[in-house]
């Protein structure tokens, strides 16, 4: 399998052909300020994220059209939007800051694509389109067949000879014409249960592959939808659930 350093800057290598958002890598507050300006802020909205992180930690959105007043009265306290001034103040609290990425903001449709592959050859591929996304969590989605999205991911899988279970995150630009790869996660993704609901149980199939068992030919049930809802549960003083 080709060695891919964790700090490899793929867009600097035109041979890979991978379409990614325009971005800058920064290590200091001053470099971040320069990157924000170079990428078009305040005319353009931007995303600022830690190069190493998970679960939406270290990610904020810069949008000059959203005021602090609007954030206070119209956004929940866990909003991902932040003002430029607050971002600079926050990052200036320490003498050093971790590597960060300043990138163009992609407001279009979000896709997650899950794979089970055999050393670069895809065995199963399931793509999920986000219908309602809140702080990077798909609250509702549909399993659909998007050839453009799957083709981009498949090229990466074959180029890097990826193996086992893993997943991609992609975002479209504002007019939903162009998909961009945002992340490649070398693990089972949090939304893989939706693939199982659509008839392709990737964790189970991954175990069968490792055990050398034959794998069935499967096609996802396109159109399968997931809607995440929260429901209160009530218990008595002894901890027994109340059904009423």
Language-model features, listed with the residues they occupy:
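Electropositive phosphate-/nucleotide-binding environments in soluble metabolic enzymes
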Residues: 26-29, 110, 147, 200
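Short loop/edge segments at beta-strand edges and connector loops
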Residues: 27, 104, 166
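Short beta-strand or tight-loop elements
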Residues: 43-44, 98, 109-111, 164-166
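Short, glycine/charged-enriched secondary-structure capping and boundary segments
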Residues: 61-63, 117, 197-199
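ATP-dependent carboxylate activation and anion-phosphoryl transfer catalytic cores
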Residues: 131-136, 142-244
């Amino acid at each position: 399998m080709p060695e891919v350093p964790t700090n490899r800057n793929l867009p600097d290598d035109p041979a890979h052909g991978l379409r990614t958002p325009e971005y800058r890598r920064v290590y200091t507050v001053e470099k971040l300020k320069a990157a924000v300006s170079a990428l078009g802020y305040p005319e353009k909205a931007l995303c600022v994220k830690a190069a190493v992180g998970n679960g939406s930690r270290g990610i904020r959105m810069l949008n000059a059209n959203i005021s602090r007043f609007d954030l206070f009265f119209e956004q929940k306290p866990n909003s991902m939007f932040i003002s430029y001034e607050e971002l600079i103040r926050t990052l200036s609290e320490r003498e050093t800051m971790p590597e960060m990425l300043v990138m163009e903001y992609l407001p279009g449709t979000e896709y997650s694509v899950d794979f089970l592959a055999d050393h670069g050859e895809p065995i199963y591929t399931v793509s999920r389109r986000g219908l309602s996304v809140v702080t990077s969590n798909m609250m509702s989605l549909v399993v659909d067949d998007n050839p453009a999205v799957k083709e981009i991911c498949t090229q990466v899988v074959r180029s890097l000879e990826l193996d086992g279970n893993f997943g991609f995150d992609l975002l479209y630009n504002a007019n939903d014409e162009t998909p961009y790869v945002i992340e490649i996660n070398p693990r089972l993704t949090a939304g893989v249960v939706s693939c199982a609901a659509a008839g392709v149980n990737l964790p189970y199939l991954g175990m069968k592959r490792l055990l050398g068992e034959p794998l069935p030919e499967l096609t996802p049930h396109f159109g399968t939808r997931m809607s995440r809802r929260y429901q209160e549960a009530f218990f008595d003083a002894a901890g027994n659930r109340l059904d009423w």
